[in-house]
């Protein structure tokens, strides 16, 4: 049991690649928390995909013992949070579990959009923020400019920012001292009823669900009967411990401490991030504020390329869902692609991470259908439906209006690319909210439809700014707009996997582009194939794929025209019949390429 005044809880806030995980590694290494022989890069990022992409996906934690210059021993609890917008709710929970943040900014790059988003969350959580300028060993480092930028853009005093090189270990001692001296100690009442915040949870094959908790008030011991206040589920605690970063069992956790519990919990879905844990008997009356259930935002279909792998895919998806409560799925069948699953994700990075993990860890090749967002459909009889898949769109005559999700996008961009960025946002039906300058960079805030962003907005943004723009977004709600379902018909048969929701003004342009693309991608058959884009019964674009022609008159010698005509008529009749009964094979690449719409 540690005295409250000797505990410091903190997180590290940074943009991707600004050195957050490397700084965490150095703090762990320099305090001797991990033996040198056990040390490895990105120690807290357990998944291969986290290391490979250089991102943190789950909130990880480590308890560090540190003897400060004043001779006292302190316990430092670091929660290493995800930096990406898709995992923003995980970040906000982790922020509420600690009292301070280290704001890590790359001294060669300056402040980026995700830095901003996460700093604002830290400010919302009333954090004491210590700026850290990283990568000072690089020749391009310009600490004074970046410190000025932190003051201009974020409004935090950066005169005493710590200058470090996480790679070489310069400034690590100063960072540890700043954590002890400048960050506040936690508060809490040992004798009050137990209140513990559920920060994260994951599944372990031997222990069941492991729950990461921050104790706010009270004491949690092995053998206690606990209750989750959101779900009312009750469990007996069978193990309590802390991470150093390996698990170490302890007898109890008191106020201000961060650790883990196991309680024979079978499913991650039973433990909701942000929930309050209390004692079953004599528990707390009120839960901790700020709980929100996680809601999937982007949906898409996952289908195995080889239909015999469907059962393996089901197995893989069920195992991933054990560990990720924000990932939802249900079975779906498609005339074009066979059996698969309709899955819900927090955003595009979440979708990519899950898809990569299925392909890598379970060795299943996947086809991913067009990502779509959740639309609200208001029927004329007053009923409201949620539409996850454009193919399920009800009859338009019964629909009163549709609403689509909107986001607030913050884009930081060097001012020479500003015109291109504004044009891209206008093309995507954006409404400009704000434009400000910090040094030579512009900060643009746009209200955009999420539907226009989920596809390839990020790739387009990177290409028009040569990779210099950084982008971050938050959901802001739903708004009505003139949206229609565009179907694609190949040989007069609708292809459900290519149905998309588009704005009526852009439907013709989108439909024409889709038809032209499919014409190039579908191989020619023995009969001609019409490719059409339609809204309801009205065709808005059409391309015709011409037939392969066999020269049936090659054997005719001499000049008998009637013989030739007879053979050509017979061929024509055969092609007509073939077109009636023939099946058009659409290759897998056609689905993937047709959905990547280049404006």
Swiss-Prot record:
Domain tr-type G stretches: 5-187
Broad class of the protein's primary localization: membrane
Membrane topology: Peripheral membrane protein
Pfam families hit by this protein: EFG_C (PF00679), GTP_EFTU (PF00009), GTP_EFTU_D2 (PF03144), LepA_C (PF06421)
Family named by the database record: Belongs to the TRAFAC class translation factor GTPase superfamily. Classic translation factor GTPase family. LepA subfamily.
HAMAP family assigned to the protein according to its UniProt record, in alphabetical order: LepA
Protein name: Elongation factor 4
Organism whose genome encodes this protein: Ruegeria sp. (strain TM1040)
Gene designation per UniProt: lepA
